[in-house]
Amino acid sequence: FSIKCFSFDLEAMELGYDKIKERLGELRLKKFGLTVKEQDLIGTLEVALEMTARGFKFGSVDLNKSHSKNFIIDEDQKTLIPPFRAIDGLGDTVANNIIIEREEKEFISIEQFQKRCKVSTTLIEKMRLMGILKNLPESSQLSLFDMM
């Protein structure tokens, strides 16, 4: 499963079969009012629905494991980890920057991650909401309160 698709509903995919089916139903009800992105999403969700029906599970995008374009199998969790490109608005350049920078040195803060990988504030906010950055502090600076 690679990133030949351009639209993903990562939340629905992670929640599984029932949520994917529900989302497909919502899109199909719209029929003629679908955007190009929503039309692409239908195909992606149909594949995801089939995969979940066969026992596959989707995980979350993972800062330390995700590939730029390909889904990765997480043997421990028995899930497919989505690539960075599955995040709406995140392009090839940023996805590749994340991989390169991650291999070079561990990220110690969101601030440092954003600078090193050249990620926009909008994408940082999306990644926060998706829980991708949950293990990183905002800043690299130490606070007196952190030392207590």
Regions found by a protein language model. Give the residues of each.
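Noncatalytic, beta-rich nucleic-acid-contacting surfaces in large DNA/RNA-processing enzymes
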Residues: 1-148
